[in-house]
Amino acid sequence: SRIPSVDISRRFDYLYNYQHHCTEQLTSKALPLLFVSQFKAVDEEEAQKIKTNVQEAIRQLYARQIPNGGFVYWPGNASADEWITSYAGMFLILAQEKGYAVNSNVLNKWKRFQRAAAQNWRMPDQDDSWGYWQTGVQQAYRLYTLALAGAPEQGAMNRMKEQAGLSIQAKWRLAATYALTGKMKPAEELVYNAETTVSPY
């Protein structure tokens, strides 16, 4: 069957002109630009536009990292947002893989923050169902970003794997983390007979 047209060029034009700039939005604007050439032909002019936009996002993210290595949601915030820290760090790692210069000190501070957060993580009481779901997904994503950065936190991964009541999303993300590190057996154990459909939330 034919795949409907999604007008890729128009979608990327929207990203170039996106004007909202919390750290999540800043990262969401730049992240897809790393992969434009996989979806459409890119001439020299557009390649330069992509490069400029990605480099500017990297520069702005540097200014949103606080001394402990985490990233804030808005400039001027005093404390790191754990989800945003994982997301921004993932973008920086992928940008580096695509050949962009990323400050090693920024990445090292980020890794330290991620490792400490991963090691200190504990699942909350199940009475708080939303918090229970959210923190599990957050930890699995954090572990995934560390593995992506070549710094897997194996002990925290193994502890989480044994945690009862993990959500579908957390299981699949943790399985992807194991797969990234080449450990297919625990990855397969996590998702054996696991659901592939996520309920609305």
Model-derived features: where do they sit?
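Solenoid-like repeat scaffolds
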Residues: N158-I168, Y192-Y201
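Extended, solvent-exposed functional surface patches
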Residues: S1-W133, Q139-A140, Y144-A147, Q154-N158, ...
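Proline-centered turn/helix-capping motifs that create local helix->coil transitions or kinks
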Residues: A63, G150-A151, G182-P186, V198-Y201
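Solenoid-repeat scaffolds in large eukaryotic assemblies
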Residues: Q154-M157, M184-L190
